[in-house]
Amino acid sequence: MPLLHADMQREVIECFPEFIDDRQHDEVVESLLEQMDGNSALLPPVLDALSNLHLDDALLATVQHKVMPKLQSAELQVLPLLVKFLLQTAGSGAESTSVLRSIRDLDVTALRLGFDEGDRETKREREREGASAESLVIDSLRGGFRCNFAITTVVLKELEKTQTEHTPMDVWMLLVLHSLPGHRPKVHAICRKQAKRGVLTAAVVRRAVAASLSALREYFSEALALAGTLTRDSNPMPRRVGSAFYHTLFVTFEEDFHRQEVLQGLITHTGSASAREVDCALEVARELSAQEPHAADLRRHLQFVQNIMDYMEAFADEQIRTLYSIFANLSLSAMRSTGSMPMDDQIHILLRKQLGHPDALYKRMGILGATAMVTCFGAVQHPAATDATAADAEPSACLIPAELLKYIEGMLEMVFTSCVGKPGCLAFAYDELALAFEQSNCTKVDERILTNIFERASEDFEGGYLLDLGDDAALSPAPMPDWLSLKSQAWMNLDQHNAVIILNVLPLAASALSSEREQLTTLCSLFRLLVSTTRLTSGSVEDIDAVLGCPLYMMAVTTSTAGAASAMTSSDSINIFDSAFRAFFSNLPRREKELVTKCVFVATNWTRELLNGFCMEKSTEMRVKTRQRLRDLVGLERKLDICLEFLLRLMVSS
């Protein structure tokens, strides 16, 4: 053999199994292993010859022991042959576990390691060789599993009991096993179990799939099926891995067919009755829409994304916010590429229809969508902002082009206009805006948007709910209906004679006009929005601290004990005043009972909002007033309990 030419040596070795007697196998194997150690170029024919010889268990173990160390240093062209040989010759005993572990330790991400940047042609050739080697390694896994059923059982057991983080090779094995008949349920169970343990992670999935496009193209449907199974799991950790599968498949496989399949899988999840599935699918789409160039890729399949809207009626509020954030991101992506705002796109048309719909459900969806899009558009630093505009702005301000600002203002006006005469919807719109501005991603909203909303909220609040007090904080009489016998009184006046405003509660609650009575529905929501915008524009709520100590325009509690209670300062005064209020309330006619209950309910919610708005302030004066408001809240809740107790009796008796 040493005297023969290399090509002749390969041909002779390949012919060994045809003319060697079984009794000579030991000597032949020893010779072949020596040839393999002496000349790595002979490794392929040696492996081919060894796989066609009849070897006993001891001799086979010797061969495997010699071959396994060559896995880590094998050339790209030889590696698939080594993998296939080891899998086909592995049994079901302990040696098969060693064989499997040596294969699992392969760093599949290193198959495409190129040369230095200076040798570009060689690097591209190396990358092509790596891609081909990846495909051949996966083919060798499939061939080994199909030819040796015993090893598949060992593989499944080893993967299931793994306690450390899985490798990309493990993911390849799972995908190959998933493609073989009869193994799908077991592979699904292993993936869910290992994901729950935290050893099958999103990072492993990304490493296994992202760098192996050509190799895994045949197994795209297997990866998609695994993604769906993991996303449907009730545990958040498998869902996280399922999301990584979907995200990586969309980014890695650039063909339209593959991306449409990924989107169709996500759409299927959004139509599920499981809120967890919907959240997971929407979050994947949101992440893709928030990143370039993935947002541009997603826009090319916008029709598929819009199919999610078919399930919107079943979505929770947060899911609707996420959905419209996706569309807002895609609109911004289109604006960056075209330079203009799509004013008549389908999403804008849908929002107009929802906001104009008489059904509160659709109007609510429109408010959620419009608010999500406003905050998304307003929080983005757009490259179209001019240098001059940027120079005039504060460093922390987020500047957006005039066209986009006009679009946002128009959408806000559309929201407020659609809520005219519908206080419940208007209160919800205020709450949505306040919630959006309190979130961390809105700290860079264009200050012009915040200022416009603050000015509108401030004007509506002052004009709708505050009255001026006379000299020495005297309460001016307000018009009351004829049926009302209650006298008016200022409650909870912390500013005493310095008070200049009072919160108008009783006159609004007792008004003969339904529009004025319904104004109280939006009181707390509007104040919450006012606090949010004030804090973002000024850094604190000192500009509106006058409302913290101002009194409430309420009814006088006219009993013999009420005056004594109001004069006391000990903790017993609350109990005495509760007794006085109970006596006062019990003697009222039903209509006045309902009115007083409404006033106390409004006062309770108002005090709670004051605490929410001012509890973080550092000023000593405001902290003292806040503590007093906390005491007031306790007293109001006791009064509200008394009111509800009596009203419940009336409802039962009637």
Describe the residue ranges of each PLM region.
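Long internal repeat-built scaffold domains in very large eukaryotic proteins
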Residues: 1-9, 14, 20-26, 30-34, ...
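Alpha-solenoid HEAT/ARM repeat scaffold
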Residues: 10, 44, 80, 240-243, ...
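Short, hydrophobic/aromatic alpha-helical segments in well-folded domains
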Residues: 15, 31, 226, 245, ...
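Helix-turn-helix repeat elements of alpha-solenoid scaffolds
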Residues: 23, 148, 216-221, 256-259, ...
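Eukaryotic, compositionally biased intrinsically disordered regions
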Residues: 25, 229, 294-297
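Extended, well-ordered protein cores
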Residues: 191, 204-205, 226-238, 242-251, ...
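Eukaryotic tandem repeat interaction scaffolds
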Residues: 305-320, 328
